[in-house]
Amino acid sequence: MTTTLERRESASFWEQFCAWITSTENRLYIGWFGCLMFPTLLSAISAYIIAFIAAPPVDIDGIREPVAGSLLYGNNIISGAVVPSSNAIGVHFYPIWEAASIDEWLYNGGTYQLVVLHFFIGVCAYIGREWELSYRLGMRPWICVAFSAPVAAAAAVFVIYPIGQGSFSDGMPLGISGTFNFMLVFQAEHNILMHPFHMLGVAGVFGGSLFSAMHGSLVTSSLIRETTENESANYGYKFGQEEETYNIVAAHGYFGRLIFQYASFNNSRALHFFLGAWPVVGIWFTAMGVATMAFNLNGFNFNQSVVDSQGRVINTWADILNRSNLGMEVMHERNAHNFPLDLAAGESLPVALVAPAVAA
């Protein structure tokens, strides 16, 4: 008997590397987009943690009045933040090598640009990695489309808005109270509450929460029991089973009687498309709204729109909102300018021509 031994060709190191990168058998899928995502996100996270703990104060307004944001400089978890880059830098690209020293780079808030730009590249690569894994597994590509909504929102507040306003100092601070400060100042300067795209975003977020709660409770309440009363219902199901887990007809009938017939879905694909599309489209609109307001195309102004027959103004909620906007703008950057832009831009009027007479 003759035995023939065929020499086995060994794959090159590059081929082995490619197979490992694109393998769906790995516990954590890497992918070619992951080669960009992992280093950028790790850089952003590392810089953020270090800056949140120990970064020195940043001259955010460019007027030599630094603002402290780190824990070691007196902040706590609520008040702490990575403070945005200085207004003196504007929208210039400000890597470490552009500064004369590390101290100057930290004083001008270079850490903020480092974190934000690496984070933005990382989450964009995460979208690509979602598409790549879906492609490898033969799935449809809608997961990455859904994730594009929060990425669009992040791009709007961290990249597009600072560019539109002319300075990264107008970007959203990376902290809890800094986020709230950004929201208040945004309302004061752009009247975002009166912008229709923001209204659609609110409907998307709150509506999505409502629909998610309704769907989850209906599914949990209409599970098809596969076990006896003496066993847990969870033992009757296994991951990837072909049989239905819950009775959509029963859920449809319940909800149709609870509200009205056409308020419920009897098609699972249409139902889940709606659950995915509603919040995603809403957040897309919010991101577009912030992007347009970045270039000062602001919310509607209905101030002093209602007057009586004598021409006297009848205040509406729009006027109340306008007064609160002016108040917030007065408090914002109080040392950088004396008046809000809305007040400082008007023609000055004399308030007194002569000194009042004082009775003896």
Curated annotation (Swiss-Prot):
It is an enzyme of class 1 (oxidoreductase). Residues 345-360 form a propeptide. It is a multi-pass membrane protein. It comes from the Eukaryota. The D1/D2 heterodimer binds P680, chlorophylls that are the primary electron donor of PSII, and subsequent electron acceptors. It shares a non-heme iron and each subunit binds pheophytin, quinone, additional chlorophylls, carotenoids and lipids. D1 provides most of the ligands for the Mn4-Ca-O5 cluster of the oxygen-evolving complex (OEC). There is also a Cl(-1) ion associated with D1 and D2, which is required for oxygen evolution. The PSII complex binds additional chlorophylls, carotenoids and specific lipids. Fe cation binds at residues 215, 272. [CaMn4O5] cluster binds at residues 170, 189, 332-333, 342, 344. Belongs to the reaction center PufL/M/PsbA/D family. This is Photosystem II protein D1. It comes from Emiliania huxleyi. The gene is psbA.
